[in-house]
UniProtKB/Swiss-Prot annotation:
InterPro entries in the record: Helicase_SF3_DNA-vir, P-loop_NTPase, PPV_DNA_helicase_E1_C, PPV_DNA_helicase_E1_N, PPV_E1_DBD, PPV_E1_DBD_sf, Rep_E1_papillomaV, Znf_lg_T-Ag_D1_dom_sf
Modifications the protein undergoes after translation, according to the UniProt entry: Phosphorylated.
Name used for this protein in its record: Replication protein E1
Family matches, as Pfam families: PPV_E1_C, PPV_E1_DBD, PPV_E1_N
Subunit comment: Can form hexamers. Interacts with E2 protein; this interaction increases E1 DNA binding specificity. Interacts with host DNA polymerase subunit POLA2. Interacts with host single stranded DNA-binding protein RPA1. Interacts with host TOP1; this interaction stimulates the enzymatic activity of TOP1.
An example Gene Ontology biological process: DNA replication
The protein's Enzyme Commission number: 5.6.2.4
Subcellular location, record wording: Host nucleus
Keyword list, A-Z: ATP-binding, DNA replication, DNA-binding, Early protein, Helicase, Host nucleus, Hydrolase, Isomerase, Nucleotide-binding, Phosphoprotein
Binding residues for ATP: G438, P439, P440, N441, T442, G443, K444, S445
Annotated region described as Disordered, given as residue ranges: 84-103
Gene that encodes it: E1
The organism of origin for this protein: Bos taurus papillomavirus 6 (Bovine papillomavirus 6)
Positions of the SF3 helicase domain: 398-562
Family that this chain belongs to: Belongs to the papillomaviridae E1 protein family.
Length: 609
């Protein structure tokens, strides 16, 4: 083809195309302008699903974090509002609703149930509105913090349990016996006990050596055995304290001495009745590496020594108990039971008494037998021997002049009183009753009661006169006192007791026994009735020795008695006027051989009383 023709065709083609697209270009321009005018839309735009997509993505991230944590520890989150939702959907019941204790999770807690409810399997339920998505991150952070706190708490428990298990394993490895096999647990740290077992870990060697000396002032027995372990030095203590102590007190004591924490020590009381435990302590006490201070505790010796075992097998002997009560002058049943039980740790027969099932029976029999012996011994004694023995039991000294000054103050001739008092002590017929007459507050009762305490007499009370046995104490008395006799008392005496005041034998009714024949002991009576001036009691005038106290008892400026009338005053009085009262039996006893002590059981001479 000719090149000129080819160029013409190209130009014609361009011209044709330009003419055809002219109108289209104008319409396209107009349309492009309309599109550009709508490029910026100022109308309110709807959110759509972008926020929900973001919340789902965040929830998935938290869910992955939770699953990663649950692979290590099986934890389940608590949803405190899930219970509220379930309760709100229920139909109301007739019963009144109860107040429930709900956990408070802070601001906007109600959105927690809508945002992310995590069940035990780790799944999540639906999401709420746009407002809930704004706080979803905060709620998720709170859940993660709660999980971390629970993980830390569980970890601390695991570490503490692991430490204790490690220490117990080390103890068992070193001594071939578990710590719990040697001790009995005390749940309360304030429970006191004399014997304690201690296992200490991690203390320094020099402090353990120093504890040997520092603990001696607190203990009657101390045993220390030291070993080395992977935790450092381990020490085993067996302690018998002088006084009962609690775990808290002993813990503070070891913290000061060994400078260790309470987690590094075990403190429990030993098993006192376990033969394997006692054998273990007895065996290691003979070890060359053990430090011993004091004598072996009785609870170990009792189970490991043949002599102690024979003593434990010894049956109860009532005669030894009676001998003990007689030597200590115990005749009251509660006193005998209490004091003999206290001797169980020292006396084998007392320990056997505690093992008996008939303790009440034995106590009654012991008290009754002691009374029999004491009464028979009293009847064999003369008045002089009895007074001498009673005054020897009074410790201290008094002034006999107080009694003489008091009699002079009341206007009584001392020589006349001394003669009557001598006849009273010797039981002269018709001179066997001394009466003190006077108005109130003159010292009558103080005068006779102090004499009664000094001579260990008995007291009669007319309030018991309706009973046939109100005079029964006269059977076991060397002297008796009837205080504040009224007209009814004198009428009774005038009717029934004339022979008794004479000092002749009378028949005395005894409880649970047949009437016995006795002579009334010397009798002191105080009264406000002028019995010697009343003709109604004329038959008693010859049987009574009467002295009148007309003056009130003297007092000092402080309101205290100016004259001291007590058992010490009477002790000095009898010592001063012993010969004048013709109480010479004590002097005769000093010239002869001393009487042998009473024995009601076959016992050795060196036996403990």
């Amino acid at each position: 083809m000719d090149p000129n023709e080819k160029g013409i065709e190209v130009l014609s083609f361009i011209d044709e195309q330009a003419e055809c697209s002219g109108s289209d270009s104008e319409e396209g321009y107009e349309e492009s302008q309309s599109d550009l005018s709508d490029l910026i839309d100022n109308t309110e735009c709807e959110q759509g699903n972008s926020a929900e997509l973001f919340a789902q993505q965040e929830a998935l991230a938290v869910q992955e974090h939770i699953r990663a944590s649950k692979r290590k520890l099986k934890l389940s989150f608590r949803n405190p509002l899930q219970c509220i939702t379930s309760h709100s959907n229920r139909t109301p019941s007739r019963a009144a609703p109860k107040r429930r204790k709900l956990d408070d999770s802070g601001y906007n807690e109600d959105i927690l149930g809508e945002v992310a409810q995590v069940d035990e399997n780790g799944g999540s339920e639906g999401y709420g509105s746009l407002g809930s998505q704004n706080v979803s991150g905060r709620v998720q952070v709170c859940n993660v913090n709660a999980a971390n706190k629970e993980n830390d708490l569980c970890g601390s428990f695991l570490r503490a349990g692991s430490r204790r298990a490690t220490q117990l394993a080390i103890f068992k490895d070193k001594f071939n016996i578990s710590f719990n096999s040697l001790t009995r647990p005390f749940k309360n740290d304030k429970t006191c006990c004399n014997n304690w077992v201690g296992a200490m870990f991690g203390a320094r060697d020099e402090l353990l050596e120093a504890s040997k000396m520092l603990l001696q002032r607190h203990c009657d027995y101390l045993m220390l055995l030291m070993h080395t372990c992977k935790l450092g030095f381990m020490a085993l203590y067996l302690l018998e304290f002088k006084h009962a102590k609690s775990r808290e007190t002993i813990r503070h004591l070891f913290q000061q001495i060994l400078q260790i924490e309470k987690e590094e020590m075990f403190l429990e009381p030993p098993k006192l009745k376990s033969l394997p435990a006692a054998t273990f302590w007895w065996k290691i006490s003979h070890s060359a590496s053990a430090y011993i201070y004091g004598e072996l505790p009785d609870w170990i010796a009792r189970q490991t020594s043949l002599s102690h075992q024979r003593q434990d097998d010894q049956p109860f002997d009532l005669s030894q108990m009676v001998q003990w009560a007689y030597d200590h002058n115990y005749t009251d049943e509660p006193t005998i039971a209490y004091n003999y039980a206290r001797m169980a740790s020292e006396d084998s027969n007392a320990a056997a008494f505690l093992r008996c099932n008939s303790q009440v029976k034995f106590v009654k029999e012991c008290a009754q037998m002691t009374k029999y012996y004491k009464t028979a011994e009293m009847r064999e004694m003369s008045m002089g021997k009895w007074i001498k023995r009673a005054l020897d039991e009074i410790s201290g000294t008094g002034d006999w002049k107080d009694i003489i000054n008091f009699l002079k103050y009341q206007g009584i001739n001392f020589l006349s009183f001394l003669a009557s008092f001598k006849d009273l002590l010797h039981g002269i017929p018709k001179r066997n009753c001394l009466v003190i007459v006077g108005p109130p507050n003159t010292g009558k009762s103080m005068f006779v009661m102090s004499l009664m305490k000094a001579l260990k007499g008995r007291v009669l009370s007319f309030v018991n006169s309706k009973s046939h046995f109100w005079l029964q104490p006269l059977n076991a008395a060397k002297i008796a006192v009837l205080d504040d006799a009224t007209k009814a008392t004198w009428s009774y005496i005038d009717t029934y007791l004339r022979n008794g005041l004479d000092g002749t034998p009378v028949s005395l009714d005894m409880k649970h026994r047949a009437p016995i024949q006795i002579c009334f002991p010397p009798l002191l009576i105080t009264t406000n009735v002028q019995v010697m001036k009343d003709p109604l009691y004329m038959y008693l005038h010859s049987r009574l020795m009467c002295f009148e106290f007309p003056n009130p008892f003297p007092l000092n400026e402080a309101g205290q008695p100016a004259l001291i009338l007590n058992e010490l005053s009477w002790k000095s009085f009898f010592a001063r006027l012993w010969r004048q009262l013709d109480l010479s039996d004590a002097e005769d006893a000093e010239d002869g051989e001393p009487p042998s002590p009473f024995r009601c059981c076959a016992r050795s001479a060196d036996r403990h009383l």
